[in-house]
């Protein structure tokens, strides 16, 4: 069955830019339908669907050098094709940017994960990819119930982190922080969750905002080359994903995640901008209240809350771009089956 759909595998066929990936459909002995739509895009349809069937987008490779999720996704697809991995949910697997992955670069012209807002952008390789991904989402979510829509966008962090894995929950106009989504996070042993406080330009935000999908950006370890990822540290995530796809009850115990709210976004305003810490500072490094950690022009950058921590710091961003997120730990609860905080 594998040879009839892929010459090597979903991942490595997608990366072989010298050979076309022809759209085709096959069915496994278990009755699962696999539709290869285009390079890097595979739809998987279970043999039977019902009112509880999820419509899940599982994407990776938005940044070309974040390869751990690609290796995991490739294994899931291999096991679906062979029949080893049961399928109970309709899935759209996406490997977004093969050209960048082949070069082992984050992007070619501009950051793909900043192109999903509704603002005009300069034409580029990445803008064409973003436009194509928007079309794929529209087609995949067409004629589906909002409650059935999920989107897990899988990444790796550029830098080390106090939390090896963490999730970013987008802020959308729809209720997209369901109890079932957060239960999956705990089952996957994702160490922390960041609750965004404003709209953004990411792929997962786009799904949440435009399709009311239960959406997350998941940061899984640190950037490495294909074959050099520490996948054993993502075992619980691997198992939780397999249980999610098959709708099986997990056999391993969940683990509580540390919850953070985004307290503010630091946007670079001046040429004279810098942080006081080194480039290898870890995500979620915390500061004391009032501690100065950088400057923007004449203005010092300081912690406004005790224990306020920094995530995704980048001193090299252009003026007007996000230079960091600041986060604080928060207690959460559920209202109407949605995660909230005071």
Curated annotation (Swiss-Prot):
Its EC number is 3.5.1.96. It catalyses: N-succinyl-L-glutamate + H2O = L-glutamate + succinate. Binds 1 zinc ion per subunit. Coiled coil: none annotated. The keyword Membrane does not apply. Belongs to the AspA/AstE family. Succinylglutamate desuccinylase subfamily. This is Succinylglutamate desuccinylase. It comes from Vibrio cholerae serotype O1 (strain ATCC 39315 / El Tor Inaba N16961).
């Amino acid at each position: 069955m594998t040879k009839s759909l892929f010459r090597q595998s979903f991942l490595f066929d997608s990366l072989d830019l010298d050979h076309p990936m022809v759209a085709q459909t096959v069915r496994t002995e278990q009755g699962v339908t696999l539709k290869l739509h285009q390079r890097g895009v595979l739809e998987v349809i279970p043999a039977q669907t019902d009112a509880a069937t999820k419509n899940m987008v599982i994407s990776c490779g938005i940044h070309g050098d974040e390869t751990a999720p690609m290796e995991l996704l490739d294994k899931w697809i291999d096991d679906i094709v062979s029949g080893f991995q049961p399928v109970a949910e309709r899935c759209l697997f996406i490997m977004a940017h093969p050209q960048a992955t082949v070069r082992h670069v984050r992007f070619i012209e501009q950051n793909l994960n900043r192109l999903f807002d509704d603002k005009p952008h300069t034409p580029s390789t990445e803008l064409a990819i973003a436009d194509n991904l928007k079309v794929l989402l529209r087609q995949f979510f067409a004629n589906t119930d909002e409650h059935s829509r999920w989107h897990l966008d899988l990444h790796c962090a550029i830098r080390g982190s106090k939390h090896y894995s963490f999730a970013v929950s987008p802020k959308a106009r729809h209720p997209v922080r369901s109890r079932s989504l957060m239960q999956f996070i705990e089952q996957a042993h994702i160490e922390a969750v960041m609750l965004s406080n404003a709209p953004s330009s990411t792929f997962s935000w786009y799904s949440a905002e435009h399709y009311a999908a239960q959406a997350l950006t998941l940061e899984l370890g640190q950037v490495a080359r294909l074959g050099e990822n520490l996948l054993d540290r993502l075992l619980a995530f691997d198992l939780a994903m397999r249980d999610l796809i098959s709708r099986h009850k997990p056999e391993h115990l969940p683990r509580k995640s540390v919850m953070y709210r985004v307290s503010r976004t630091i946007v670079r305003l001046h040429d004279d901008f810098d942080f006081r810490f080194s480039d290898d500072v870890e995500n979620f490094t915390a500061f004391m209240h009032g501690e100065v950690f950088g400057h923007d022009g004449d203005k010092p950058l300081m912690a406004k809350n005790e224990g306020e921590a920094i995530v995704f710091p980048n001193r090299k961003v252009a003026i007007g771009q996000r230079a960091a997120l600041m986060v604080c730990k928060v207690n959460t609860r559920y209202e109407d089956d949605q995660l909230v905080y005071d």
